[in-house]
A protein has these predicted regions:
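Juxtamembrane intracellular "pre-TM" segments in multi-pass secondary transporters
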Residues: 1-3, 183-217
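Short amphipathic helix-loop junctions that connect adjacent transmembrane helices
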Residues: 25-39, 231-247
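Conserved MFS/SLC helix-loop-helix module at the cytosolic interface between two early adjacent transmembrane helices
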Residues: 53-92
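Helix-to-loop junctions at the C-terminal end of transmembrane segments
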Residues: 56-67, 262-276, 360
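Cytoplasmic helix-loop-helix junction between adjacent transmembrane helices
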Residues: 98-137
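Helix-loop-helix hairpin linking two adjacent transmembrane segments in secondary transporters
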Residues: 132-180
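C-terminal membrane-cytosol helix-exit motif in multi-pass small-molecule transporters
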Residues: 170-188, 382-386
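C-terminal transmembrane helical hairpin of 12-TM major facilitator-type secondary transporters
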Residues: 262, 277-321
Length: 391
């Protein structure tokens, strides 16, 4: 029964993130159509992660108290509403409203990871979390391409309503899948136990659980550099090599493919041989090597190699570290733990885009990637500290 639950969860995660990914590349063009300055555009992206950062621990606690299914359904409903607001936006304030609502309602990822943890034995948890990570990667991989096709190539006549409606319909479809195919994974007994226990906030949880604190810090460092890469790569590629959107899109598609392959299959093969701690460490080293390679790349081939290393590194680190984090939870507070852990990544996605531009302008085109490599390396120490203090 437990293995049967992972298939529908995978499908729900793909469809959910696909709807989100469809609209990601369209927001800059929508903001430009409304005359938004670059700083305002950055803020539109950052406000989503900021709201997600605030809300994720709350969603995690609610999923422990009321179950995973209600949180998934509520989050998908909020996402559907935010897509409609975005598609029919009449100004920049509408864009902000959409992203704020979407960020506050983004409890889906933490709930999906908690669900996968619920239905997986400890020895298979990394593989199950990797499967959810792969589903998220597929959504991010296919979404932007589909969004571009739906909107059209001519920016003067591009339709933003069509992609938004498709995204909203995907959310409704995902709600139906959760309702009819996903049984509740958080048992009534666990929920009753959670209701009678003292509530622990995210900061207190990090203080009381050193291993979780170290893992969350490692995730923050890695995700920060990932956000730097994603936010500045197109500008770097244009100015250094003259790469257009098609080439950049192909390169980022390849990065996402490798990350998905690692999370969906590579982790399943490597964790039994290496363990989560060693695989997470190798993931950090590979990601750092990829960032350095991109920074010094003299041509398209080396750039592709660097991005390939980044994809493999991130795809190795994320499910391994998530599995280690889930092991710091008791059965009654797994959602809270995963929500707290995911908040560190949300914080990194707030900070990364805001600093990549100034670093690029002040220190040169390759500097953001080199700074990212230096920031990421200490994650190895935090991983090993987490292993030493793990439950």
């Amino acid at each position: 029964m437990r293995n049967k639950q992972l298939g529908p969860l995978f499908l729900v995660s793909v469809i959910d993130i696909l709807g989100f990914g469809i609209l990601i590349p369209l927001v800059p063009y929508m903001a430009d159509r409304f005359g938004a300055a670059p700083a305002v555009l950055t803020a539109i992206f950052g406000v989503y992660s900021l709201c997600q950062l605030i809300a994720a621990p709350l969603w995690g606690r609610l999923s422990d108290r009321f179950g995973r299914r209600p949180i998934l359904i509520s989050s998908l409903t909020g996402a559907c509403a935010s897509y409609i607001i975005l598609g029919f936006a009449q100004g920049v304030d509408w864009l902000f409203a959409s992203r704020i609502l979407g960020g506050f309602m983004a409890g889906n990822i933490a709930a999906a990871f908690a669900y996968a943890s619920d239905v997986s034995p400890p020895e298979k948890r990394a593989a199950s979390l990797g499967m959810v990570g792969a589903a998220i990667g597929i959504g991010f991989m296919l979404g932007p391409a589909i969004g571009g096709l739906l909107a059209g190539n001519d920016l003067r006549t591009a339709s933003f309503v069509r992609p938004a409606v498709v995204s909203a319909c995907l959310s409704l479809f995902a709600i139906a899948l959760v309702t009819f195919l996903l049984p509740e994974s958080n048992t009534a007994e666990r929920r009753r136990e959670h209701a009678t226990r003292e509530r622990v906030g995210p900061l207190r949880m990090l203080v009381e659980r050193p291993a979780l604190r170290f893992l969350a810090t490692a995730a923050l460092l890695v995700t920060f550099s990932q956000a730097v890469l994603e936010s500045i790569f197109a500008l770097w590629a244009l100015n250094k090599f003259g790469f257009g959107p098609r080439t950049v899109g192909l390169l980022m598609f390849c990065l996402a493919c490798l990350a998905v392959l690692m999370q969906g299959g590579g982790v399943r093969l490597l964790v039994p041989r290496l363990g989560e701690g060693k695989l997470a460490t190798l993931g950090v080293l590979t990601f750092v090597a990829g960032l350095v390679t991109v920074a010094v790349a003299p041509n398209l081939v080396m750039t592709g190699l660097g991005l390939a290393l980044c994809g493999i590194g991130v795809g190795s680190f994320n499910p391994s570290a998530s599995s280690l984090a889930s092991k710091q939870a008791d059965v009654h507070d797994r959602g809270s733990v995963m929500g707290t852990y995911q908040s560190s990544s949300s914080l990194a996605r707030v900070i990364g885009p805001f600093v990549s531009g100034p670093i690029y302008a002040a220190l040169g085109p390759g500097a953001p990637f080199l700074v990212g490599a230096c920031v990421t390396l200490p994650a190895i120490w935090f991983i090993w500290r987490a292993r030493a203090r793990s439950r």
